[in-house]
Amino acid sequence: MADREWILLNPGPANTTPTVRAALVMPDLCHREPECFEMVRRCRDGLTRLAGAGNDWTAVLFAGSGTASVEAAICSAIPPGRAILVVDNGVYGDRMARIARAHGIPVETVRADMFTPIDPSAVDAALGARPEISHVAVVHHETTTGLLNPVAEIAKVAARRGRRVIVDAMSSLFGERLTIAADGLDFVTASANKCLQGIPGVSFVLCRRSAVEALADRSPRSVYLDLHTHYAQQERDNTPFTPAVQVLHALEQALAELEREGLDRRIARYAENARVLRDGMAGLGFEILVAGPGRSNILTTFRLLPGLTYDVLHDAMKRRGYIIYAGQGDIRTYAFRVSNMGTLTPADMNAVVHAFADSLKELGIEVGHRSVSTRQK
């Protein structure tokens, strides 16, 4: 495991390179000096360029976890007197709805179970029935289960209906294919510490410039999280509040490392990581709970084997240097999650499978082969 004390199999913060971590140890820098603003601009430019967003998009940075960027987009984008349609098929879709309600924004939801991608026709029907809806909010990769929602199709539906889309791409941007400049998309939120392989503490909103500039005359719902305030200040090489200076320095290093690896190669590495993990876990008898077509290449939810509890399995894996992740919500009692983002390689994932096998042997759990693609509750 070389420079890593733990192999992190949680969906962020992910394992990082020594050079990203070393970037945190920089000379002290005042956040209102030109050197800091130049770093902010380089990070903003790098994010939009590497995301393939184009010149009519920009990035707005926030000091905070990923949820800060989601809340900034939602509380800023919805005009007074309008409503938001939230796709809810997991914990993070539900969180988007709770954010909107906390700001007094009327919310309509379209739901599916946490193992099923949303049907775009359900979004279309909801938009047709509710003319007061101005925006659709959808999580691209629901890390509740490792489910991918069809963002491109939802964006097309919204565009046909004259509505705009907010995407939570927290755990998919730079790890799954996502066309940022698709018709209908206005705001895409993410953070530094997932597929970007940076350090927690900075999140961002990729914004269509015309959409964020349209917020200029809007009365803000939030002091700290008003999207246009941050955009306008950052455009002028300024900041309304103190940014996470050292974390931004690490973000700049993470962007440089993504550029060197190449986005296509990173996505391919994650996909191969997932394949090695899933094939190996199937050989141990673990069942994947999300069917193939809607499954991400970043996280897998497995059913616990008979006689096995999560806490016991977690502790056995931790003794071997691996941190797995509990199921969320209703599935916590019978499922657990394994992510393969970050600096992990297929060789690492092979070692993960061997650690699971060794843990099961220690715990006296029978190992047997099952299909990798079945799901029955």
What residue ranges belong to the model's regions?
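Active-site C-terminal subdomain of aminotransferase-like
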Residues: 15-16, 193-279, 283
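Active-site phosphate-binding strand-loop segment of PLP-dependent enzymes
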Residues: 117-174
